[in-house]
Amino acid sequence: MHLSGDDVIVWQYGVVKLNQTIVMTWVIMVFLAGGSAFLTRRLSSGIRISRWQSFLEMIVTMAMQQIREIGLRQPEKYLSYLATLFLFVATAVLFTIIPGYEPPTGSLSTTAALALSVFVAVPLYGIERVGFGAYLKSYMKPTFIMLPFNIISEFSRTLALAVRLFGNMMSGVMIIGILLGIAPLFFPVLMSVLGLLTGMVQAYIFSMLATVYIAAATKSRDE
């Protein structure tokens, strides 16, 4: 059992290698894109809507309400990005029920890429909200001496996001691998269920931390 899909080479041409992590990342992205298109193909803007559309709207409303409670006044502007983060991590976890599947989130390269997207999104949303000059000045609050510390803080929390998600996902894979050698039937099933629950919690925490960072960039920086 491999701890990471990085170790499994699916295709290679010279120095160019395509590992399982990259393949499964694209599989998840295609699955989410195709699933979204399929589930929303019959949505209506009219008065009469289906029960399915009513259910989807209820979920979207709940998500926007939670985003608003964190501090983002216009949650619809951020919902697509934050929901994509959650759905990607959650889907990567749910696919672990497939035999032989290794979640791409068990690779530091994937979690680093997700954290990097948050690192880029935070200043973009902040600049869009308060302007380029005001956003840059926020790094010198309450005094210009804080500039290097605020910059270090931006990088350190990005690293923390990547390592936190990677550590939790990798630990689940390692525990299941160990228990497979002890009790090939009972323990892996139990740990798989617990792993799914833990993974969903991690997906939620990751997206909520991204929401908090964006809220800090668009709210507190403008005060």
From Swiss-Prot:
NCBIfam families associated with the record: altF1_A, ATP_synt_6_or_A, PRK05815.2-3
Quaternary structure annotation from Swiss-Prot or TrEMBL: F-type ATPases have 2 components, CF(1) - the catalytic core - and CF(0) - the membrane proton channel. CF(1) has five subunits: alpha(3), beta(3), gamma(1), delta(1), epsilon(1). CF(0) has four main subunits: a, b, b' and c.
Family, similarity comment: Belongs to the ATPase A chain family.
PANTHER family: ATP SYNTHASE SUBUNIT A, CHLOROPLASTIC
InterPro entries according to UniProt: Alt_ATP_synth_F0_Asu (IPR017692), ATP_syn_F0_a_bact/chloroplast (IPR045082), ATP_synth_F0_asu (IPR000568), ATP_synth_F0_asu_AS (IPR023011), F0_ATP_A_sf (IPR035908)
Subcellular location: Cell inner membrane
This protein's name: ATP synthase subunit a 1
Domain of life: Bacteria
Keyword RNA-binding: no
Record GO terms (molecular function): proton-transporting ATP synthase activity, rotational mechanism
Topology class, membrane: Multi-pass membrane protein
Function: Key component of the proton channel; it plays a direct role in the translocation of protons across the membrane.
Parts of the chain that traverse the membrane: 20-40, 78-98, 107-127, 173-193, 194-214
Natural source organism: Prosthecochloris aestuarii (strain DSM 271 / SK 413)
A single GO cellular-component term on record: plasma membrane
PROSITE patterns associated with the record: ATPASE_A
Keywords assigned: ATP synthesis, Cell inner membrane, Cell membrane, CF(0), Hydrogen ion transport, Ion transport, Membrane, Transmembrane, Transmembrane helix, Transport
GO biological process, one term: proton motive force-driven plasma membrane ATP synthesis
